[in-house]
A protein has these predicted regions:
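Outer-membrane beta-barrel "beta-signal"
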Residues: 217, 296-298, 308-310, 328-344
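Detector for outer-membrane/organellar transmembrane beta-barrel domains
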Residues: 163-277
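Repeated loop/turn-to-beta-strand initiation elements of outer-membrane beta-barrel proteins
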Residues: 81-87, 121-130, 168-175, 207-214, ...
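Short glycine/proline- and aromatic-enriched beta-strand/turn motifs that initiate or cap beta-hairpins
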Residues: 21-100, 335, 341-343
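Outer-membrane beta-barrel proteins
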Residues: 52-58, 94-100, 137-143, 182-192, ...
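Transmembrane beta-barrel strands of outer-membrane/channel proteins
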Residues: 43-53, 87-93, 130-136, 175-181, ...
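Residues on the lipid-exposed face of transmembrane beta-strands in outer-membrane beta-barrel proteins
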Residues: 73-79, 114-120, 160-164, 199-205, ...
Length: 344
Protein backbone atom coordinates (compact mmCIF):
# COMPACT_ATOMS: atom_id res chain seq x y z
CA UNK A 1 0.00 0.00 0.00
CA UNK A 2 1.40 3.33 -1.01
CA UNK A 3 2.47 5.70 1.71
CA UNK A 4 0.60 8.52 -0.03
CA UNK A 5 -2.71 7.00 0.96
CA UNK A 6 -1.49 6.40 4.50
CA UNK A 7 -0.48 10.07 4.74
CA UNK A 8 -3.98 11.10 3.70
CA UNK A 9 -5.42 8.91 6.46
CA UNK A 10 -3.04 10.37 9.03
CA UNK A 11 -4.19 13.87 8.06
CA UNK A 12 -7.83 12.77 8.36
CA UNK A 13 -7.19 11.25 11.78
CA UNK A 14 -5.53 14.45 12.98
CA UNK A 15 -8.46 16.48 11.69
CA UNK A 16 -10.87 14.32 13.66
CA UNK A 17 -8.78 14.67 16.82
CA UNK A 18 -9.18 18.38 17.50
CA UNK A 19 -11.35 19.42 20.49
CA UNK A 20 -13.81 21.25 18.22
CA UNK A 21 -15.26 17.84 17.42
CA UNK A 22 -15.77 16.78 21.02
CA UNK A 23 -19.54 17.16 20.68
CA UNK A 24 -19.55 14.15 18.37
CA UNK A 25 -19.06 11.86 21.36
CA UNK A 26 -22.61 12.52 22.58
CA UNK A 27 -23.88 9.86 20.23
CA UNK A 28 -27.20 10.21 18.43
CA UNK A 29 -29.42 13.03 19.62
CA UNK A 30 -32.86 11.72 20.58
CA UNK A 31 -34.44 14.74 18.90
CA UNK A 32 -32.60 14.17 15.62
CA UNK A 33 -33.14 11.24 13.27
CA UNK A 34 -30.36 9.06 11.90
CA UNK A 35 -30.76 10.42 8.37
CA UNK A 36 -30.70 14.02 9.61
CA UNK A 37 -27.46 13.42 11.49
CA UNK A 38 -25.96 11.56 8.52
CA UNK A 39 -26.59 14.61 6.35
CA UNK A 40 -24.70 16.92 8.73
CA UNK A 41 -21.33 16.44 7.05
CA UNK A 42 -18.49 18.06 5.16
CA UNK A 43 -15.94 16.62 2.80
CA UNK A 44 -14.61 16.90 -0.71
CA UNK A 45 -14.64 15.41 -4.19
CA UNK A 46 -11.64 15.50 -6.45
CA UNK A 47 -9.26 14.04 -8.97
CA UNK A 48 -5.51 13.49 -9.15
CA UNK A 49 -2.73 12.47 -11.52
CA UNK A 50 0.55 10.79 -10.56
CA UNK A 51 3.48 10.11 -12.87
CA UNK A 52 6.33 7.88 -11.70
CA UNK A 53 9.60 7.26 -13.57
CA UNK A 54 11.97 4.57 -12.23
CA UNK A 55 15.33 3.26 -13.45
CA UNK A 56 16.90 0.26 -11.72
CA UNK A 57 20.52 -0.66 -12.43
CA UNK A 58 20.23 -4.30 -11.39
CA UNK A 59 22.51 -7.01 -10.05
CA UNK A 60 22.74 -8.44 -13.58
CA UNK A 61 24.26 -5.20 -14.91
CA UNK A 62 21.19 -4.31 -16.97
CA UNK A 63 18.89 -1.34 -16.52
CA UNK A 64 15.16 -1.82 -16.01
CA UNK A 65 13.05 1.24 -16.85
CA UNK A 66 9.51 1.63 -15.54
CA UNK A 67 6.96 4.38 -16.08
CA UNK A 68 3.69 4.34 -14.15
CA UNK A 69 0.78 6.74 -14.63
CA UNK A 70 -2.03 6.72 -12.07
CA UNK A 71 -5.15 8.78 -12.74
CA UNK A 72 -7.68 9.15 -9.96
CA UNK A 73 -10.83 9.52 -12.02
CA UNK A 74 -13.01 10.17 -9.00
CA UNK A 75 -12.42 10.52 -5.28
CA UNK A 76 -14.89 11.44 -2.54
CA UNK A 77 -14.30 12.14 1.15
CA UNK A 78 -17.11 12.19 3.75
CA UNK A 79 -16.58 13.71 7.22
CA UNK A 80 -19.32 13.72 9.87
CA UNK A 81 -18.19 15.82 12.85
CA UNK A 82 -21.17 14.80 15.00
CA UNK A 83 -20.27 11.12 14.69
CA UNK A 84 -16.50 11.70 14.57
CA UNK A 85 -16.51 9.53 11.46
CA UNK A 86 -14.93 9.88 8.03
CA UNK A 87 -14.84 7.74 4.90
CA UNK A 88 -12.86 7.88 1.67
CA UNK A 89 -13.39 6.24 -1.72
CA UNK A 90 -11.28 6.60 -4.84
CA UNK A 91 -11.39 5.06 -8.32
CA UNK A 92 -8.06 5.03 -10.15
CA UNK A 93 -6.76 3.91 -13.53
CA UNK A 94 -3.17 2.68 -13.53
CA UNK A 95 -0.78 2.02 -16.42
CA UNK A 96 2.72 0.62 -16.00
CA UNK A 97 5.31 0.22 -18.76
CA UNK A 98 8.49 -1.78 -18.15
CA UNK A 99 11.48 -2.02 -20.48
CA UNK A 100 14.49 -4.32 -20.03
CA UNK A 101 17.13 -5.31 -22.60
CA UNK A 102 15.34 -7.92 -24.72
CA UNK A 103 12.09 -7.74 -22.74
CA UNK A 104 9.09 -5.46 -22.27
CA UNK A 105 5.96 -5.56 -20.15
CA UNK A 106 2.78 -3.44 -19.95
CA UNK A 107 0.19 -3.59 -17.19
CA UNK A 108 -3.19 -1.84 -17.16
CA UNK A 109 -5.31 -1.87 -14.03
CA UNK A 110 -8.26 -0.44 -12.13
CA UNK A 111 -7.80 0.35 -8.44
CA UNK A 112 -10.52 0.89 -5.82
CA UNK A 113 -9.58 2.62 -2.57
CA UNK A 114 -11.77 2.34 0.54
CA UNK A 115 -11.03 3.94 3.90
CA UNK A 116 -13.11 4.21 7.09
CA UNK A 117 -12.01 6.21 10.14
CA UNK A 118 -13.88 6.31 13.47
CA UNK A 119 -12.51 8.63 16.14
CA UNK A 120 -13.18 9.10 19.85
CA UNK A 121 -12.41 12.26 21.80
CA UNK A 122 -10.83 11.53 25.21
CA UNK A 123 -10.65 15.13 26.42
CA UNK A 124 -7.71 17.35 27.38
CA UNK A 125 -6.25 17.14 23.87
CA UNK A 126 -6.28 13.34 23.66
CA UNK A 127 -8.09 11.35 20.98
CA UNK A 128 -8.10 7.80 19.71
CA UNK A 129 -9.74 5.77 16.98
CA UNK A 130 -9.20 3.21 14.27
CA UNK A 131 -8.76 3.25 10.50
CA UNK A 132 -9.55 0.39 8.13
CA UNK A 133 -8.35 0.60 4.53
CA UNK A 134 -8.63 -1.63 1.50
CA UNK A 135 -6.90 -1.19 -1.85
CA UNK A 136 -8.26 -3.59 -4.45
CA UNK A 137 -6.61 -3.74 -7.88
CA UNK A 138 -7.48 -5.77 -10.97
CA UNK A 139 -5.06 -5.63 -13.87
CA UNK A 140 -3.87 -7.32 -17.06
CA UNK A 141 -0.25 -7.89 -18.09
CA UNK A 142 1.03 -7.98 -21.67
CA UNK A 143 4.54 -9.17 -22.58
CA UNK A 144 6.24 -11.38 -25.20
CA UNK A 145 5.20 -14.38 -23.08
CA UNK A 146 1.69 -13.51 -21.85
CA UNK A 147 -1.24 -11.67 -23.39
CA UNK A 148 -3.78 -10.31 -20.93
CA UNK A 149 -2.58 -12.29 -17.90
CA UNK A 150 -5.00 -11.40 -15.10
CA UNK A 151 -3.87 -10.20 -11.68
CA UNK A 152 -5.88 -9.38 -8.56
CA UNK A 153 -4.38 -7.68 -5.52
CA UNK A 154 -6.16 -6.94 -2.22
CA UNK A 155 -4.24 -4.94 0.41
CA UNK A 156 -5.81 -4.61 3.86
CA UNK A 157 -4.69 -2.27 6.63
CA UNK A 158 -6.14 -1.86 10.14
CA UNK A 159 -4.65 0.91 12.27
CA UNK A 160 -5.72 1.87 15.79
CA UNK A 161 -4.27 5.29 16.59
CA UNK A 162 -3.66 7.68 19.48
CA UNK A 163 -3.20 11.45 19.10
CA UNK A 164 -2.49 14.37 21.39
CA UNK A 165 -2.39 18.15 20.93
CA UNK A 166 -1.51 20.79 23.51
CA UNK A 167 -3.19 24.10 22.60
CA UNK A 168 -1.18 26.10 25.12
CA UNK A 169 2.23 25.07 23.81
CA UNK A 170 1.21 24.17 20.21
CA UNK A 171 2.71 20.70 20.09
CA UNK A 172 1.31 17.22 19.68
CA UNK A 173 1.82 13.81 18.16
CA UNK A 174 0.14 11.18 16.01
CA UNK A 175 0.82 7.47 16.54
CA UNK A 176 -0.59 4.22 15.23
CA UNK A 177 -0.08 0.47 15.32
CA UNK A 178 -0.85 -1.25 12.00
CA UNK A 179 -1.81 -4.77 10.99
CA UNK A 180 -1.41 -5.33 7.26
CA UNK A 181 -2.27 -8.22 4.99
CA UNK A 182 -2.11 -8.48 1.21
CA UNK A 183 -3.04 -11.28 -1.16
CA UNK A 184 -2.18 -11.31 -4.86
CA UNK A 185 -3.45 -13.78 -7.45
CA UNK A 186 -1.19 -13.67 -10.53
CA UNK A 187 -2.95 -16.43 -12.51
CA UNK A 188 -0.29 -18.51 -14.31
CA UNK A 189 2.43 -16.65 -12.40
CA UNK A 190 1.18 -17.96 -9.06
CA UNK A 191 0.14 -16.33 -5.79
CA UNK A 192 1.76 -14.08 -3.20
CA UNK A 193 0.77 -13.18 0.36
CA UNK A 194 2.30 -10.67 2.78
CA UNK A 195 1.39 -10.24 6.45
CA UNK A 196 2.92 -7.97 9.04
CA UNK A 197 2.80 -5.15 11.56
CA UNK A 198 4.10 -1.61 11.71
CA UNK A 199 4.47 1.15 14.27
CA UNK A 200 4.43 4.88 13.47
CA UNK A 201 5.10 7.83 15.79
CA UNK A 202 4.98 11.44 14.59
CA UNK A 203 5.58 14.30 17.06
CA UNK A 204 5.26 17.89 15.79
CA UNK A 205 5.55 21.46 17.07
CA UNK A 206 4.08 24.71 15.70
CA UNK A 207 5.95 28.03 15.76
CA UNK A 208 3.64 30.68 14.31
CA UNK A 209 3.36 29.87 10.60
CA UNK A 210 5.95 27.10 10.89
CA UNK A 211 5.40 23.47 11.81
CA UNK A 212 8.28 21.08 12.47
CA UNK A 213 7.86 17.35 12.90
CA UNK A 214 9.51 14.00 12.47
CA UNK A 215 8.02 10.65 11.46
CA UNK A 216 9.47 7.46 12.95
CA UNK A 217 8.42 4.16 11.36
CA UNK A 218 9.16 0.46 11.86
CA UNK A 219 7.65 -2.54 10.03
CA UNK A 220 8.02 -6.32 10.12
CA UNK A 221 6.45 -8.61 7.53
CA UNK A 222 6.37 -12.25 6.38
CA UNK A 223 6.24 -12.97 2.63
CA UNK A 224 5.25 -16.12 0.77
CA UNK A 225 5.26 -16.50 -3.01
CA UNK A 226 4.29 -19.70 -4.83
CA UNK A 227 4.04 -20.70 -8.48
CA UNK A 228 0.76 -21.81 -10.03
CA UNK A 229 1.80 -25.43 -9.40
CA UNK A 230 2.31 -24.73 -5.69
CA UNK A 231 6.12 -24.82 -5.65
CA UNK A 232 7.85 -22.20 -3.51
CA UNK A 233 9.30 -19.11 -5.17
CA UNK A 234 9.96 -17.19 -1.97
CA UNK A 235 9.63 -17.61 1.78
CA UNK A 236 11.10 -14.58 3.54
CA UNK A 237 10.81 -12.14 6.40
CA UNK A 238 11.15 -8.41 5.93
CA UNK A 239 11.79 -5.44 8.18
CA UNK A 240 12.02 -1.72 7.48
CA UNK A 241 12.72 1.38 9.54
CA UNK A 242 13.06 5.05 8.67
CA UNK A 243 13.16 8.54 10.10
CA UNK A 244 11.53 11.40 8.16
CA UNK A 245 11.93 15.04 9.31
CA UNK A 246 9.13 17.32 8.07
CA UNK A 247 9.11 21.12 7.69
CA UNK A 248 5.91 23.00 6.82
CA UNK A 249 5.14 26.71 6.36
CA UNK A 250 1.60 28.12 6.13
CA UNK A 251 1.23 31.37 4.19
CA UNK A 252 -1.33 34.00 5.11
CA UNK A 253 -3.09 33.51 1.77
CA UNK A 254 -4.03 29.88 2.65
CA UNK A 255 -1.05 28.29 0.92
CA UNK A 256 1.11 25.59 2.53
CA UNK A 257 4.67 24.70 1.51
CA UNK A 258 6.20 21.52 2.92
CA UNK A 259 9.32 19.39 2.60
CA UNK A 260 10.15 15.90 3.86
CA UNK A 261 13.40 13.94 3.82
CA UNK A 262 13.38 10.20 4.54
CA UNK A 263 16.40 8.18 5.58
CA UNK A 264 15.84 4.49 6.13
CA UNK A 265 16.81 0.91 5.51
CA UNK A 266 15.16 -2.45 5.05
CA UNK A 267 16.26 -6.06 5.06
CA UNK A 268 14.82 -9.21 3.47
CA UNK A 269 15.92 -12.62 4.77
CA UNK A 270 15.10 -15.58 2.53
CA UNK A 271 14.52 -19.04 3.95
CA UNK A 272 16.45 -22.14 2.88
CA UNK A 273 13.54 -23.25 0.67
CA UNK A 274 13.24 -19.99 -1.30
CA UNK A 275 13.62 -20.54 -5.04
CA UNK A 276 15.16 -18.55 -7.86
CA UNK A 277 18.67 -18.71 -6.45
CA UNK A 278 17.58 -16.93 -3.26
CA UNK A 279 17.89 -19.78 -0.74
CA UNK A 280 19.40 -18.33 2.46
CA UNK A 281 20.15 -15.07 0.64
CA UNK A 282 19.70 -11.77 2.50
CA UNK A 283 19.04 -8.38 0.89
CA UNK A 284 20.00 -5.04 2.47
CA UNK A 285 18.64 -1.76 1.14
CA UNK A 286 19.44 1.88 2.00
CA UNK A 287 16.60 4.33 1.32
CA UNK A 288 16.90 8.05 0.63
CA UNK A 289 13.83 10.06 -0.34
CA UNK A 290 13.05 13.79 -0.57
CA UNK A 291 9.63 15.36 -1.14
CA UNK A 292 8.68 18.97 -1.88
CA UNK A 293 5.03 19.98 -2.09
CA UNK A 294 2.67 22.94 -2.13
CA UNK A 295 -1.06 23.24 -1.35
CA UNK A 296 -3.16 26.29 -2.19
CA UNK A 297 -6.75 27.09 -1.33
CA UNK A 298 -8.53 28.84 -4.21
CA UNK A 299 -11.68 30.68 -3.23
CA UNK A 300 -13.87 29.16 -0.55
CA UNK A 301 -14.11 25.64 -1.94
CA UNK A 302 -11.14 24.60 -4.07
CA UNK A 303 -7.84 23.12 -2.92
CA UNK A 304 -4.98 22.49 -5.37
CA UNK A 305 -1.88 20.43 -4.57
CA UNK A 306 1.38 19.67 -6.36
CA UNK A 307 4.19 17.42 -5.16
CA UNK A 308 7.58 16.26 -6.44
CA UNK A 309 9.48 13.32 -4.97
CA UNK A 310 12.95 11.96 -5.63
CA UNK A 311 14.03 8.56 -4.31
CA UNK A 312 17.34 6.74 -4.38
CA UNK A 313 17.64 3.16 -3.10
CA UNK A 314 20.84 1.11 -3.06
CA UNK A 315 20.55 -2.62 -2.41
CA UNK A 316 23.15 -5.29 -1.69
CA UNK A 317 22.81 -9.03 -1.12
CA UNK A 318 24.70 -11.61 0.89
CA UNK A 319 25.39 -13.95 -2.06
CA UNK A 320 25.31 -13.52 -5.84
CA UNK A 321 23.61 -15.93 -8.21
CA UNK A 322 25.65 -17.32 -11.10
CA UNK A 323 24.13 -14.99 -13.69
CA UNK A 324 24.59 -11.79 -11.65
CA UNK A 325 27.42 -9.40 -12.47
CA UNK A 326 27.70 -7.17 -9.39
CA UNK A 327 26.64 -6.94 -5.76
CA UNK A 328 24.73 -3.69 -6.01
CA UNK A 329 21.34 -2.70 -7.39
CA UNK A 330 20.45 0.99 -7.50
CA UNK A 331 17.05 2.55 -8.07
CA UNK A 332 16.47 6.19 -9.01
CA UNK A 333 12.88 7.40 -9.03
CA UNK A 334 11.13 10.67 -9.90
CA UNK A 335 7.45 11.15 -9.02
CA UNK A 336 5.13 14.08 -9.80
CA UNK A 337 1.72 14.25 -8.13
CA UNK A 338 -1.08 16.75 -8.92
CA UNK A 339 -4.44 16.95 -7.15
CA UNK A 340 -7.56 19.13 -7.28
CA UNK A 341 -10.28 18.98 -4.59
CA UNK A 342 -13.66 20.68 -4.29
CA UNK A 343 -14.60 21.02 -0.63
CA UNK A 344 -18.12 21.24 0.72
Amino acid sequence: MKRTLISVSVAAALALSFPTLAASERGMDSDTGFLDEAMQFGGHVGTSLEYEDKVTDGFDGNKKKEKTTTHEVFGVYYNNARWNLSALYGLKLENREQRNPGYHENEDGIKHLFSLNKGFDLGNGWATGAIYELEYTRSKVFSPYVSGLRKELAEHSFRPYLTYFNNEHNWGFYSNLEYLYSSEDKSAWGERTEEGYSLLFKPYKRFGNWELGVELYYQIKDNEDRSSSGSINEISDFNEKYIEPIVQYSFDDAGVLYARVRVGENETNNAANSGGGNANVDYFKDIRKATLGYEQAVGDNWLLKGEYEYANEVEEKSKLAGWEAKNESELKQHTVYLQALYRF
